[in-house]
Design a protein with these regions (language model features):
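Short, surface-exposed beta-strand/strand-loop-strand elements in extracellular ectodomains
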Residues: 35-53, 177
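Asparagine-centered strand-capping/turn motif at beta-strand->loop junctions
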Residues: 30-36, 165-167
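Surface-exposed ligand/attachment interfaces on beta-rich extracellular proteins
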Residues: 7-26, 47-50, 77-88, 108-110
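Short, intrinsically disordered N-terminal pre-domain segments
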Residues: 1-22, 169-185
C-alpha cells in the first residue's frame, strides 16, 4: 500500500488533556502516528479527544477516514453580521448546516478569507427541479468590509475538520498527515 501525502503534515503535542489541530480537508483519509505514548484520537468539526475515543498504540500508524472532501468555487459574497457566500451556479452544494469551512482565494478586500467558520443557513436556489446555485451563511462578521471590492475569481470554500488527541498519561507527539492511498489495503 502506497501513501501520497496531501497538504502539510501537522504535529500535536499530546498529554492527558485533549489537544487539537484544524485543517482544510483535501482527501478522504488521514494518517496518524503517535510517538512515545499511546493516544486516543477524535475527528470532527470541533473534536475533543477522550479516553473512550479511537485508540492508537505508540509507534503504530493508523489511517482514518475523514468522510467527504468538499470544496466549491465562490461566485460572490454579501456582508453583514453573518456573511452570505454565493456558490458557483450549476454545481450543486456539497455543504450542510454545521459544516465548518475555510474561505480562501478572495482578493481585493482583506478580511473575507477566514478559517473555522460554521455554516448556519443553507439556501438552495432552484427553479423547478434545477438548482442554479446556492447560498451559505457563515458565522463571520463582515460588516466592516466592502463586498464590491472582493474579487472572487479564484475563491473557494472548503470543508474543515479537527483532529484531537490525548494520552492516558504522560506526554508525546502525534503526527497527522492527509494522504491518498493506492494499492492493496
Amino acid at each position: 500500500m502506497a501513501h501520497q501525502p496531501v497538504g502539510d503534515s501537522q504535529t500535536i503535542t499530546t498529554s492527558a488533556t485533549s489537544a487539537r489541530v484544524q485543517f482544510a480537508v483535501q482527501t478522504d483519509t488521514v494518517r496518524v502516528v503517535p510517538i512515545s505514548q499511546n493516544v486516543h484520537v477524535a475527528i470532527g468539526t470541533t473534536a475533543t479527544a477522550t479516553t473512550s475515543d479511537y485508540f492508537v498504540p505508540a509507534g503504530t500508524p493508523a489511517t482514518l477516514n475523514l468522510g467527504r472532501a468538499s470544496s466549491m468555487g465562490i461566485a460572490g459574497v454579501t456582508t453583514g453580521a453573518a456573511t452570505v457566500i454565493d456558490l458557483s451556479e450549476g454545481m450543486g452544494n456539497p455543504f450542510k448546516v454545521d459544516d465548518v469551512l475555510t474561505i480562501s482565494g478572495i482578493t481585493g478586500e482583506t478580511g473575507f478569507n477566514t478559517t473555522a467558520k460554521v455554516v448556519s443557513i443553507q439556501e438552495a436556489r432552484t427553479i423547478g427541479y434545477a438548482q442554479f446555485g446556492a447560498k451559505l451563511t457563515i458565522d463571520h462578521d463582515s460588516r466592516g468590509l466592502f463586498a464590491g471590492d472582493a474579487v472572487v475569481t479564484a475563491a473557494e470554500a472548503r470543508r474543515t475538520l479537527t483532529v484531537a488527541a490525548r494520552t492516558d498519561s504522560g506526554s508525546g507527539k502525534l503526527y497527522v498527515q492527509q494522504v491518498q492511498i493506492s494499492g492493496d489495503q
